[in-house]
Amino acid sequence: MPYLLLCIGCVFLGLGVLGLFVPSLQSLDLLTVQTLSHHRLDYLNSITTFLARVGGMPFVCFLSFLVCMYLAWYKKYITVIFISLGVIGSITMGWLLKWCVNRPRPPEAYHIVESYGASFPSAHSVYASTLACLAMIMLCHKHNINSPYNVLISCLWFVCMGLSRIYAGVHFPTDVLAGWGIGFIWIALLWLWLLQTQSRLSRKQIYF
């Protein structure tokens, strides 16, 4: 499973990177943002604004802190480290890439929410895919089954977050794809590390 996640992440990131260099993809990026800006609805605007708030770094860090405190109370320290590395690592990589690539955002005329930093990759998409992957791993292992509901809700979360950033006019589609890819790749690599750790420690110490 971590290898599948790693492959999907590489595909997403690869498509996102192509958007930086292929003129036809850049034109499609801008056309998508322009088209969505002409078909906005009030209730979708409200949902987009809400997702922009709950999907940002402050809320993600706060939520991760609460989960880690809960796990630390039950002495599940490996899981605390796993989640902490997942969140901190994805945040760091996302913002480092923003600084290095420094891709301009879509024109401000299309924005309906505030935005910070460069466009590539979408930080909200990085956070959303990271949390979705962590949730799928933790919940599936907690119940010892691959619950389709867990997977569905997790997928809906990161997909809706990514689409909302395009709808809001603050990111191009390839920014979102790259953000998803970064989250998937980072968590897949950490998952492989966790599986190696699992061979030395009991399952009870690692998962919820």
Report the location of each language-model feature.
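Membrane-embedded catalytic cores of phosphoryl/pyrophosphoryl-handling enzymes
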Residues: 4-5, 111-208
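Alpha-helical transmembrane segments of multi-pass membrane proteins, especially transporters
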Residues: 34, 82-87, 153, 176-180
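N-terminal transmembrane-helix/juxtamembrane module of multi-pass inner/ER membrane proteins
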Residues: 1-59, 99-112
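Membrane-interface loops
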Residues: 31, 73-141, 145
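Aromatic-anchored segments of alpha-helical transmembrane domains
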Residues: 13-17, 88-93, 156-166
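Alpha-helical transmembrane spans of integral membrane proteins, capturing the lipid-embedded, hydrophobic core
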Residues: 7-11, 83, 87-91, 180, ...
